[in-house]
């Protein structure tokens, strides 16, 4: 989150309540995920998803994404929770959804994955720094390959694209405009003012 968090004053009867903007938006079932995806952010998003499900398991949850990506395991924890809970999770890209951010964008409920017009989306294969003994490097390399296959399997199912094409596109950074992402199947619509 940010160092300076705006507050909102809500007037109810004779009382005033001050909320930080994120808590106020959470009351409207809106979650923000911005910046690098890590374990701390994943824990926060997962807690918010579970809380909103307990509040009303039939109303959609809105997950706004502006992320360059991050930890695969943290992203998979968020994705698993999105698929586990009963409410549909609408995903909306604002700014960018790259790497694990794009994976989460595509992981929204089918028909409810959206982007603002000038956002950018980027997919690529998992990467990580490996060091240590030769046997440890081999173990880590095998795990990265396993995660790559898992991400491709999940994404190809989620967006309805051939696994081989997706794997080929993910070999290098593959940038898309919102229109490109719509054609690709990563999103279902582009949000514009009516």
From Swiss-Prot:
Which Gene Ontology terms describe the biological processes this protein takes part in?
Answer: protein quality control for misfolded or incompletely synthesized proteins
Chief place of localization: cytoplasm
Q: Which residues participate directly in catalysis?
A: 99 (nucleophile), 124
Tell me which EC number(s) this protein carries: 3.4.21.92
CDD domains given for it?
A: S14_ClpP_2 (cd07017)
**One GO molecular-function annotation for this sequence?**
ATPase binding
Q: Say which enzyme class the record assigns.
A: hydrolase
Q: Which Pfam families match?
A: CLP_protease
Q: Does the keyword 4Fe-4S apply?
A: no
Function, in words: Cleaves peptides in various proteins in a process that requires ATP hydrolysis. Has a chymotrypsin-like activity. Plays a major role in the degradation of misfolded proteins.
Q: Which PANTHER family match?
A: ATP-DEPENDENT CLP PROTEASE PROTEOLYTIC SUBUNIT
Name the record gives this protein: ATP-dependent Clp protease proteolytic subunit
| Organism of this sequence | Borrelia garinii subsp. bavariensis (strain ATCC BAA-2496 / DSM 23469 / PBi)
